Amino acid sequence: MTVFSKKMTATIPAMLLCALLSGATTMSYADTTNPNAPVSLIEQWDKTFPESAKVDHRKVTFQNRYGITLVGDLYLPKDRGERKLAAIAVSGPFGAVKEQSSGLYAQTLAEQGFVTLAFDPSYTGESGGYPRNVASPDINTEDFSAAVDFLGLQKEVDRNRIGLLGICGWGGMALNDAAMDTRVKAVATSVMYDMSRAMGHGVGDGKDRYTTADRRAVLQYLNAQRWKDAANGTFAPGGHDIYVDDKGNVSAAARILPETLPANPNPVLKEFFDYYRMPRGFHARSVNSTGAWNATMPLSFMNMPLLSYASEVTIPTLIVTGEQAHSRYFAEDAFKAIGSKEKALVIVPGANHVDLYDNAAGKIPFATFAQFFKTNLK
């Protein structure tokens, strides 16, 4: 249902008449009076990691520039006193929720003296936005700036000492925002993806996977799905890692991860499955754990490169990745493109991509992240 202002109601009959006379039909995807409102605000602790006794936790909401209400977890060190502290906005991985990796990073850094905010991106988790399970290079970059807005208004925060930390696909978003938002004073990524490159060119073995013909085939596949969605008045779910075989045939899985792991799985699939689908990292609100994105979601990423202005990231930058991470090439290429003279690339020995999600293997270099932000948010 669409809600119109009083001013608009006078024009509705004329609009409907025009539609009838022209033989026009309308598409209606939503039936909600406030699609930008939070989906939920769960107060009890429902994270995939234990609550720290050293940190105060608050459930918070804030709006981005598009009017979507985001839901976050604010973490504050218990021993903060009355002084204003540096703050860090944290999000990711791509398709995860704040109760997973980003919350763990945020809480751990709060133990080190920072005010931190882990938040659900627009259209996912508890945050508002319709249709559900959509990502956008523009709106999700804005989500980081909205988090900066929120942090800068908190009485515990020194607004001149705010940084960003993006995990997995949110690493690219963090770098994109750091190039745009001059209020951000330091930026870090962990096992970053450039999602525009991943979806626009395919994730290969240390390099892009799609040929020019493959890209065209993927675009045709996605736009054919648009016709189906338009005809059905709904948004079909579908995987965002789209495959093109040697004959140009295009396919995508119905889910991000299978319900059960197949025999002899791809090692990267097993990494993700062992986190998102198992008790270790499963969360009911995580699209990676339970389902799929909107099938046409990759369209905006195909032609909107996130790191076009990486050379304009001139603030201190920390890029962390795993020695064995399949995503390592994203981090190394981003590091080369970053314009800052104060940048560091840290490759964690023996770590794969998901090792840096939850520290089950003890490989997340939290001390490195903490020292980076202490040095550059002072």
Give the ranges of each region predicted by the language model.
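Catalytic active-site module of serine/aspartate enzymes centered on a nucleophile-bearing elbow/loop
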Residues: 349-351, 359-378
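N-terminal cap/lid segment of alpha/beta-hydrolase-fold proteins
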Residues: 37-83
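Alpha/beta-hydrolase active-site loop
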Residues: 134-155
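Short beta-strand/loop motif that positions the catalytic acidic residue
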Residues: 313, 319-321
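Conserved alpha/beta-hydrolase
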Residues: 108-128
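The serine-hydrolase catalytic nucleophile loop
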Residues: 95-107, 121, 331
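Alpha/beta-hydrolase-fold enzymes
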Residues: 176-272
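Short beta-strand element of the alpha/beta-hydrolase
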Residues: 83-93
